[in-house]
């Protein structure tokens, strides 16, 4: 039997026809857990439906999605009603959903919530343990794949913001079995390395299964115990992992992580200029204060210096000498006036002046002045003082 050769389109169209004509596959209900959920701008919803062993892609078009009365999320256990078919453009098998009903929470989601609650109660998410991101990081350690878009985005943002910042990559698997162990090794490597300011742990978006390594408890504990601040940049803005909660800062995307970690060079230059102006002002102010204190101390020193004290003492002595001379002069003048007054008094009462007027002073032999005749009641020797001399004689009473 000759084997027929088919084109790819022939093959996919044939499989699609077989599936579309299958009674069971044309109208079925499938139970599973939602993962890798995406809401397209067109209004269509894309996700995967999985269980422990298998996964199938699903799509719900806008016309059906607008009728949904539940909010879909990753990890949700649902019952999907619709049909199976082939998307011929890619040859992929998928379910076309007409209805989606919530059944419960998926196994991974339950596991995620349990670990989240456990770590939260243990204080792993507390703000008081969050380390500050340095304002002016010089060297940033990156733990991510060496070939993904994450490292390219971080490098591009870093070059744009500040080309002086160094990026050091620790290449690690970010998806697959035990990938979290390589991420742990990267964090521990940078904690031992000198001069690293920040660590960024990142990868692109994905389903809950693809991001599950970032939900491992062992990784969460290593992030918590890191001496260096860690920025978590896992998935897209709508994706959250345990690593996001325990990290010091959660960035919605790797590019945003670089924006947070890398300071703008223009901001640094502006800050340096402001600090320079402030320092110059403070230095000038300090110099002015020092000069003022120096001048004040100089004046005080002059007042209390030995030479100043000697000069002041001389000045004080001169003042005292002037006061003493003045007091002596006043005293002399007063005494002179007293002497002149006494001299005038003596002069006024000088006996010689009386004698000049023709009077005489009579004294007995004992130099007693004879004032009355009764003092001469017998013969006595007397002395008579005249203006031009003295004469002696005997007193003879008249009988």
UniProtKB/Swiss-Prot annotation:
Location(s) in or outside the cell: Cytoplasm
Purpose: Bidirectionally degrades single-stranded DNA into large acid-insoluble oligonucleotides, which are then degraded further into small acid-soluble oligonucleotides.
Catalyzed reactions per annotation: Exonucleolytic cleavage in either 5'- to 3'- or 3'- to 5'-direction to yield nucleoside 5'-phosphates
Protein EC: 3.1.11.6
GO CC field: cytoplasm; exodeoxyribonuclease VII complex
Annotated keywords: Cytoplasm, Exonuclease, Hydrolase, Nuclease
GO biological process, one term: DNA catabolic process
Family annotation (CDD domains): ExoVII_LU_OBF
Family the entry assigns: Belongs to the XseA family.
PANTHER family hit by this protein: EXODEOXYRIBONUCLEASE 7 LARGE SUBUNIT (PTHR30008:SF0)
Gene: xseA
Organism: Clostridium botulinum (strain Eklund 17B / Type B)
Pfam families linked to this entry: Exonuc_VII_L, tRNA_anti_2
Known partners and oligomeric status: Heterooligomer composed of large and small subunits.
Protein name: Exodeoxyribonuclease 7 large subunit
GO molecular function: exodeoxyribonuclease VII activity; nucleic acid binding
InterPro entries: Exonuc_VII_L, Exonuc_VII_lsu_C, OB-fold_nuc-bd_dom
């Amino acid at each position: 039997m000759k084997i027929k050769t088919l084109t790819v389109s022939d093959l996919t169209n044939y499989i699609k026809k077989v599936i579309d004509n299958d009674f069971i596959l044309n109208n079925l209900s499938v139970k599973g857990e939602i993962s890798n959920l995406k809401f397209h701008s067109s209004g269509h919803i894309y996700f995967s439906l999985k269980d422990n062993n298998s996964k199938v892609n699903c799509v719900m078009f806008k016309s059906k999605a607008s009728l949904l009365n539940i909010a879909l999320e990753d990890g949700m256990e649902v019952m999907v009603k619709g049909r199976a078919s082939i998307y011929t453009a890619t040859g992929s098998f998928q379910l076309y959903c007409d209805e989606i009903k919530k059944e419960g929470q998926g196994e991974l989601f339950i596991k995620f919530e349990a670990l989240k609650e456990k770590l939260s109660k243990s204080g792993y998410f507390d703000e008081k343990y969050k380390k500050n991101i340095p304002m002016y990081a010089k060297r940033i350690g990156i733990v991510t794949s060496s070939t993904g878009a994450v490292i390219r985005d971080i490098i591009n943002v870093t070059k744009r913001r500040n080309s002086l910042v160094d990026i050091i990559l620790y290449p690690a698997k970010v998806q697959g079995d035990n990938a979290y162990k390589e991420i742990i090794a990267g964090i521990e490597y940078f904690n031992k390395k000198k001069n690293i300011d920040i660590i960024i742990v990142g990868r692109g978006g994905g389903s809950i299964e693809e991001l599950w390594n970032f939900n491992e408890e062992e990784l969460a504990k290593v992030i918590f115990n890191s001496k260096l601040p860690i920025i978590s940049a896992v998935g897209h803005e709508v994706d959250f992992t345990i690593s996001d909660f325990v990290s010091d800062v959660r960035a919605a995307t790797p590019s945003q992580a670089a924006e947070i970690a890398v300071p703008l060079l223009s901001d640094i230059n502006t800050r340096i200029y402001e600090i320079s102006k402030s320092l110059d002002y403070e230095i000038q102010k300090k110099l002015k204060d020092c000069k003022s204190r120096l001048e004040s101390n100089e004046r005080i020193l002059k007042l209390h210096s030995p030479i100043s004290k000697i000069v002041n003492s001389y000045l004080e002595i001169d003042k005292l000498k002037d006061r003493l001379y003045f007091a002596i002069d006043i005293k002399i003048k007063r005494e002179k006036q007293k002497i002149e007054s006494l001299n005038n008094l003596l002069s006024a009462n000088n006996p010689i002046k009386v004698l000049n007027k023709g009077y005489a002073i009579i004294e007995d032999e004992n130099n007693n002045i004879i004032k009355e005749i009764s003092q001469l009641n017998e013969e006595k020797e007397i002395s008579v003082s005249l203006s031009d001399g003295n004469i002696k004689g005997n007193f003879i009473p008249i009988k």
